[in-house]
Swiss-Prot record:
This protein binds to 23S rRNA. It is found in: Plastid, Chloroplast. This is Large ribosomal subunit protein bL21c. It comes from Cyanidioschyzon merolae (strain NIES-3377 / 10D). Its main location: plastid.
Length: 107
């Protein structure tokens, strides 16, 4: 495993920078903890050589394991209309999935 190995992967409508052997919090994925998932939409892979997709790399994938499901910190939204007695306070917590990225194999 190269210390500079990384991949840019598109999942859940966002692009993430993944390094092997680390864990990341991404948008909720509907699967059980312990399940293995495979990301096929790889945009960029730096492993033994640099591979750039146009837009995606064919026959390339990144494997991960779901560690747990969690919620993000609460985001508060406060809506107030000046000179009126209208005040509303909303709070929301995003559902997240913590994943572990497995080491990359051959390109």
């Amino acid at each position: 495993m190269s210390p500079t190995a990384y991949a840019i992967v598109e999942t859940c409508g966002k692009q993430y920078w993944f390094q092997p052997g680390r864990y990341y919090d991404i948008n909720f994925i509907n699967a059980e903890p312990g399940d293995k998932i495979i990301f096929h939409r790889v945009l960029w892979l730096q492993h033994q050589q640099l591979l750039i997709g146009r837009p995606f790399l064919p026959n390339t994938h990144v494997e991960a394991t779901i560690l747990q499901h969690l919620k993000s910190k609460k985001v508060l939204v406060y809506h107030m209309r000046s000179k009126k007695k209208t005040r509303k306070k909303y709070g929301a917590r995003q559902l997240l999935t913590r994943i572990y990225i497995h080491p990359f194999h051959g390109s």
